[in-house]
């Protein structure tokens, strides 16, 4: 397990994902708004919007909140428009970090992100400074149950034109070309598999390791970044061992 998937697992173990429903809803609503702005307000015609709405419903977000987010994206509500912005920089030890944000005020967002980097041993770089180190991919997470046959799921994913399949204890992670995410996700869904996540991810072309102290510094930086309201996702090329991930998560 690596990249954003490992980071998400660390956050889950720390209980952060359960503690901050309001913040999660804010980020999901921004996903919905951006998707509606880019592809229109119909989930039947807009795959990204459909995924965002499914994520919102899975997190028990009220229907009114979902509709308000759609209305903001399509311009019905009259609220300030959101735009997607990507920031790039380096964490401690030269680890590459990419930050996806959704904002209605670039100056506020870049100031908050720069402060997070500076206070946690990192440096905010220029656009393109580390982006070349990553590939944009589709990520599908399938929940494992007692009845799940990893070999069968792997074959189904490959038949659906997936790039790679990683089998973990509680989930099976499927990577796809980003352009094929919708098709692969729908093909797996038709097989009755329980898909918990289908989203864009940034997959590092080359991963880097760091000692324990540096690893924890980088994870703290990523945590501070992801806690910012405008930040949607944080990626890095840091490889974290299961042992260090567990140790960091236990810090609370």
From Swiss-Prot:
GO terms for biological process: regulation of DNA-templated transcription. Coiled coil: none annotated. GO terms for cellular component: cytosol. It is found in: Cytoplasm. InterPro entries: Integrase-like_N (IPR017856), TACO1_YebC-like_2nd/3rd_dom (IPR048300), TACO1_YebC_N (IPR049083), Transcrip_reg_TACO1-like (IPR002876), Transcrip_reg_TACO1-like_dom3 (IPR026564), YebC-like (IPR029072). Transmembrane segments: none annotated. One of its GO terms (molecular function) is DNA binding. Its main location: cytoplasm. Keywords: Cytoplasm, DNA-binding, Transcription, Transcription regulation. Belongs to the TACO1 family. This is Probable transcriptional regulatory protein Haur_3030.
């Amino acid at each position: 397990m690596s990249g954003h998937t490992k980071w998400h697992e660390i956050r889950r173990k720390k209980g952060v994902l359960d503690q901050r429903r309001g913040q999660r809803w804010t980020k999901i609503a921004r996903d919905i708004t951006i998707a509606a702005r880019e592809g229109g307000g119909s989930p039947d015609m807009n795959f990204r919007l459909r995924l965002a709405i499914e994520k919102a419903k899975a997190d028990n977000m009220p229907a009114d909140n979902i509709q308000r987010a759609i209305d903001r994206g399509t311009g019905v509500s009259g609220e300030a428009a959101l735009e997607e912005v990507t920031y790039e920089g380096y964490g401690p030890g030269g680890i590459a970090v990419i930050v996806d944000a959704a904002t209605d005020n670039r100056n506020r967002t870049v100031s908050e992100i720069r402060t997070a980097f500076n206070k946690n041993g990192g440096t905010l770089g220029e656009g393109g400074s580390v982006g070349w180190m990553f590939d944009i991919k589709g990520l599908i997470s399938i929940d494992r149950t007692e009845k799940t046959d990893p070999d069968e799921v792997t074959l189904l994913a490959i038949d659906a034109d997936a790039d790679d399949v990683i089998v973990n204890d509680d989930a099976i992670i499927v990577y796809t070309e980003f352009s094929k995410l919708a098709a692969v996700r729908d093909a797996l869904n038709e097989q009755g598999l329980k898909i918990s996540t289908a989203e864009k991810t940034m997959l590092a072309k080359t991963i880097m390791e760091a000692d324990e102290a540096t690893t924890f510094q980088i994870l703290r930086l990523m945590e501070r970044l992801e806690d910012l309201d405008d930040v949607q996702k944080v990626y890095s090329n840091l490889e974290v061992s299961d042992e260090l991930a567990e140790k960091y998560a236990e810090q609370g």
